[in-house]
């Protein structure tokens, strides 16, 4: 008998750069994915300063890149990111996706099922952030 790969449910949110938080217009710049049963929390984001500057010219690209690095550090559980980075992955995901009035906000949380959370994160990043740019 051939073993079938086990599917995993996940939640994800799109990271959005919001030049003017009170207006609400945004540009997708990353994705964060949490698969609780796989103990997975990952993030993909635009990291190139020139690309960030081109995508979101109204925001200081250096500042935006610094914020995105902070999100990555929290996802990775890097202790230099502060106490929230030391919490379990599910708490970090919910902290990252909590509503806030800031230059980086998240979309509503969506759910899905996959076999490989890392690969699914790449697919979501291409779908919602790259959208045909490679």
Give names to the regions the model predicted:
Residues 1-134:
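Polybasic/polar functional segments that serve as interface/processing modules
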């Amino acid at each position: 008998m051939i073993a079938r790969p086990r599917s995993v449910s996940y939640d994800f949110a799109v990271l959005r750069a919001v030049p003017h938080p009170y207006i609400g217009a945004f540009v997708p710049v990353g994705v964060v994915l949490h698969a609780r049963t796989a103990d997975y929390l990952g993030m993909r984001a635009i990291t190139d300063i020139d690309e960030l500057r081109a995508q979101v010219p109204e925001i200081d690209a250096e500042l935006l890149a610094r914020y995105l690095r902070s999100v990555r550090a929290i996802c990775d559980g890097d202790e230099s990111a502060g106490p929230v980075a030391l919490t379990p992955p599910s708490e970090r995901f919910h902290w990252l996706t909590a509503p806030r009035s800031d230059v980086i906000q998240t979309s509503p949380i969506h759910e899905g099922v996959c076999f490989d959370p890392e690969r699914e994160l790449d697919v979501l990043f291409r779908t919602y952030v790259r959208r045909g740019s490679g």
